[in-house]
Amino acid sequence: MVVIRLARGGSKKRPFYSIVATDKRNRRDSNFIERIGYFNPQAAATEQAMRIAQDRLTYWTGVGAQISPTVVRLIKNNPAV
């Protein structure tokens, strides 16, 4: 089963998350099928904190991918994505 979730990147104490489509059995930061977007919780005021490709999100949900609760919450809290 394919799931859309966060994969952690960045360095220690400075997280940066990629929003990825991956197999549910893979580890959090393991191989993924496609990178759909990103989330930067420490973005400066001039930077964009989150970006997601809506067309790819629609495609993956259309073929049966589940969205993790965290990604659902991020999408609801950032409607301008």
Swiss-Prot record:
Keywords: Ribonucleoprotein, Ribosomal protein. One of its GO terms (cellular component) is small ribosomal subunit. The keyword Lipid metabolism does not apply. GO terms for biological process: translation. SUPFAM superfamilies: Ribosomal protein S16. GO terms for molecular function: structural constituent of ribosome. The keyword Ribonucleoprotein applies. Belongs to the bacterial ribosomal protein bS16 family. NCBIfam families: S16. This is Small ribosomal subunit protein bS16. It comes from Polynucleobacter asymbioticus (strain DSM 18221 / CIP 109841 / QLW-P1DMWA-1). The gene is rpsP.
